[in-house]
Amino acid sequence: MAGRYDSNPFEEDDVNPFSEQARGKAGGQPSYGGGAFYMPNPRNVPSVSSNSRLSPLPPEPAAFGATVDIPLDSSKDLKNREKELQAREAELNKREKELKRREEAAARAGIVIEEKNWPPFLPLIHHDITNEIPSHLQRMQYVAFASFLGLACCLFWNVIAVTSAWVKGEGVKIWLLAIIYFISGVPGAYVLWYRPLYNAMRTDSALKFGLFFLVYLFHILFCVFSAVAPPVVFEGKSLAGILPAIDLISKNALVGIFYFVGFGLFCVESLLSIWVIQQVYMYFRGSGKAAEMKRDATRGAMRAAF
């Protein structure tokens, strides 16, 4: 039996394979430990010379120094642009100061610059109840504005009703009168009574209130007259009132219905207008504007007399 510290007969010697002695020994002795890679005569294997190595590729320059053409403005161009911007800024400041000076001069002269803002899709007039009319008068002004729009609606429907009567053989004269009512009635109402009321509410002017009352009474009379449409002008058929509606319903039901609708619209407009003038008159009396208007009228009469 082998001892505890006996050497292993299968253990290889501690030999440095890179030493010259080991190289000579390996060249002189056959090797049987190669297994499947055993070579009977290692001398027949051609040796690899140092000159058989692959030559390295030639070095290529790195792209760190590649130039990119980026157009940069010179300092002279930058200075020119800066001067141009400064000139534009100075011109804008000059225009702003001039506009401010004109606005202040207009304000001192009592001139109010009004921007057209209504209707929104095609501004024709300046109308801003929320910002220009006192809060306690806004409801009254809105109802007056509704009566103005109601008159425009009545006259427009009147054109439709009279057009249907003209198509059914009632003559072209009534249609021309209906067109005249619409073209002259809507802008006339705005200029003669709605705008004076708007300015009276905004400036609290007794004289403008008086102009409104005078013209608005004629407006109410016209609405009542249109609702009845007596046979005064062209048998009254130029207005869609109750009397021509009764006359036409027996001839043509559709035309008669159009006239009855017009009669209803004129009735609603008359009632709304009566409510407006009543409310405005109550405010006019309660605020002391009636007495102020009397004093102004007395002063005007005395000045005219002397």
UniProtKB/Swiss-Prot annotation:
Compositionally biased tracts (Low complexity): 40-55
UniProt keyword list: Cell membrane, Coiled coil, Cytoplasmic vesicle, Membrane, Transmembrane, Transmembrane helix, Transport
Gly residues biased stretches: 25-36
Subcellular location: Cell membrane; Cytoplasmic vesicle, Secretory vesicle membrane
Topological relation to the membrane, as annotated: Multi-pass membrane protein
Cytoplasmic side: 1-141, 278-306
Major location (coarse): membrane
Family annotation (InterPro entries): SCAMP (IPR007273)
GO cellular component terms, A-Z: early endosome; plasma membrane; recycling endosome membrane; trans-Golgi network membrane; transport vesicle membrane
Location of region: Disordered: 1-66
Ranges annotated as spanning the membrane: 142-162, 174-194, 209-229, 257-277
GO biological process: protein transport
Coiled-coil intervals, chain numbering: 72-109
Family recorded in the similarity comment: Belongs to the SCAMP family.
PANTHER family cross-referenced by the UniProt entry: SECRETORY CARRIER-ASSOCIATED MEMBRANE PROTEIN 1 (PTHR10687:SF74), SECRETORY CARRIER-ASSOCIATED MEMBRANE PROTEIN SCAMP (PTHR10687)
Function comment: Probably involved in membrane trafficking.
Protein name: Secretory carrier-associated membrane protein 1
